[in-house]
C-alpha cells in the first residue's frame, strides 16, 4: 500500500434520517458521484447502502457497508422479517461489508449467506474517554469518596439487565455495605418504574441511584467516578434487539476501570474474560454477585484488569488503529 496518498473526507448529513435515509443518501450523493472519480462511500447502515443500489451501474464507486447489531438481529423478529430481502440485496450490492463484532458478523452471514463479511471493532474516542482524578469526579457528581460504585450507562430498557445487577447487590449487601449502583440513562418509563419497585422491595433505596439522561460532557466523569462498570445484558428480546458490541465497556477501560459483562451478543468482542474484565452468564444474579465481590476484594486482580484494559484500548481500539484497518480495505480495493 502507498502510505503517502492524500484524500478528502466528506461527511454527509441530513434531516430525519430515521424515516427517509435511503432517499436522503441518494439525493445527497448524486451530484457528488457525478463530479468525483472512484470515491469510497462508507455507509453506517445497510438501509443507506440500499438507497445507492440504483447508482451501482451508473457510477463507479466503492461501497463499504458497516453493520452494528440491532439493525441486523431484529430481522429475526416477526416485526422486521419483511425487511430481510432488502437487507440481503443491500449486502450483495456492497463491495465490502464490515461488522463491528464477530457476533454481528455471524448473524449477518446467517441471514444473507454473504461470507466475505469482515470484523473491525468500533473505536474508542480517547479525547472523550480518558483518565481523570476519581476524587475530583466524585466531588463534581456529589458521590461519597468511601462508596464502592458500580455503574451502568445505557438505554433504560429491559434487555440491558439492570434488574440482574440489583438482585445481585441484594445478595452481597451485608458483605459490602457501602456498595452503590448508579444507573445512568433514560428509556422506557414502565421498565424504570419496575426497577424502582424492585429496589424498594429489596430495601435497596439507599444503594441504587437513578440519574436519568446523561449529557455527553458528563459521561467521562461518570466512568472515572465509578469503581467497576457493569452491564448484564440479555441475549435478545422479542424485537430481536441484542448487544451488537458494547462500546461502554471499552470507554470504561479507557478510564482505567475493570468491567463486568454478560456473555451475550457481541460483548465477548469487547471483554476478554479475566484480561480486561469478567464475563458472566446473563440473567444470573448469583454469578453476577460473585463477580462483583471478587473484584472488590481482590486488589491484585482489580489492578491487573485495569492496566490490561488501558493497554488493550491503545493497541486495538484507538481511532488510529481502527482507521488503519479501514484504510487497508479501501487501498487494497483500488490496488493503490
Where does each model-flagged region fall?
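Short His-centered aromatic/hydrophobic patch
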Residues: 43-48, 67
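Conserved donor-binding/catalytic core segment of Leloir-type glycosyltransferases
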Residues: 144-160, 166-169, 182
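Short hydrophobic beta-strand element within catalytic cores of glycosyltransferases
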Residues: 249, 254, 258-261, 271
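Conserved acidic donor-binding segment of nucleotide-sugar-dependent glycosyltransferases
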Residues: 272-274, 278-285, 294-300
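Carbohydrate-associated surface elements
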Residues: 103, 123
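Nucleotide-activated donor-binding/catalytic signature segment of Leloir-type glycosyltransferases, i.e.
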Residues: 193-217
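Acidic donor-binding loop of glycosyltransferase active sites
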Residues: 224-242, 257
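A short helix/loop element that forms part of the nucleotide-sugar donor recognition site in Leloir-type
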Residues: 130-143
